[in-house]
Regions:
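Bacterial Sec-dependent N-terminal signal peptides
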Residues: 1-27
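Mature catalytic domains of secreted/periplasmic carbohydrate-active enzymes
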Residues: 26-274
Length: 274
């Protein structure tokens, strides 16, 4: 035991000058930190404040009323006579929203233009709208106006579905369609309430259709390029700061199927252009 003690003492004494020498050469260096709170950087894409607010909605409804209600078609071709839209009473969005509120939902999306191009408000962008409806109830219909007013009255979130694809428009597939029809429609819808939480742009883009009597197939390629998404996003967010753009626009997307199957934990790992 004594031999071990002597050996350790000798080692400690022999190391002392080395440690002392190293300490005399050590000095602190000042450094400016760009991250003063020492927060770790993101590992994956992070949700924006707008996306987080959208996520808090949790459970909301989708109201698909329009020309398809009277043609009994899932997707209209765009050649439907406007007079077919002839409701026997004034549509009542407040009744719709009261029903979903009773179910515990926090809001709803109203389809105001599907792929057939028929607009449920008196738009200046096309004649394929309620302006030429088959009766007075139809011609007086303005779903964006009445849906927004009802949602605000009930304290619910609201937004609109507007299809980028337009099987009625003779301009579809051209730059003029994007500028004079689609973007104008989005701008009009934005005027129906700056507190909209979502604008839904369907992923179905291009295919066969009426197209003003051309009856052909049109493919537009990359939707983000054709619909001028940077301009669309900036224009919408300038007026609707909390409005998430679903589908075209890249802030929210479908789960990958129309049956509603999803993993227990699911978060989009892509950025706005993926």
């Amino acid at each position: 035991m004594k031999k071990i003690t002597y050996l350790l003492s000798a080692l400690a004494l022999s190391a002392a000058p080395v440690i002392s020498s190293a300490q005399s050469q050590f000095s602190l260096q000042s450094q400016t930190l760009t991250n003063s709170d020492n927060e770790p950087g993101p590992v994956f894409p992070l949700p924006t404040e707008r996306q987080l607010k959208w996520n808090e909605t949790e459970f909301y409804a989708f109201f698909h009323y329009g020309m398809n209600t009277y043609t009994n078609l899932e997707w209209g071709n765009g050649d439907e006579a406007e007079s077919i839209f002839a409701p026997t009473a004034a549509p009542n969005p407040e009744q719709w929203l009261k029903a979903v509120q009773a179910a515990g939902m926090k809001g709803g999306i109203a389809v105001v233009k599907h792929h057939d191009g028929f607009c449920l408000w008196p738009t200046s962008s096309t004649t394929h709208s309620v302006v030429k409806a088959g009766n007075a109830f139809g011609r007086e219909t303005n779903i964006p106006r009445d849906f927004a007013a009802a949602a605000q009255k009930l304290g619910l979130k609201y937004g609109f579905y507007v299809s980028p694809w337009d099987r009625n428009s003779a301009l579809y597939g051209t730059d003029k369609y994007v500028k004079d029809v689609f973007l104008r429609q989005c701008a009009e819808l934005a005027t129906y309430g700056t507190d909209q939480f979502e604008m839904w742009f369907d992923g179905a883009n291009g295919g066969d259709g009426y197209y003003g009597g051309q009856n052909k197939t049109i493919n537009v390629g990359d939707a983000n390029v054709y619909y001028d998404v940077p301009n669309l996003r900036d224009s919408v967010h300038k007026i609707l700061p909390d409005c998430v753009m679903w589908g075209v626009g890249g802030e929210a997307r479908w789960i990958g199927n129309e049956q509603g199957w999803a993993g227990e934990t699911n978060w989009c790992m892509g950025d706005g252009t993926s």
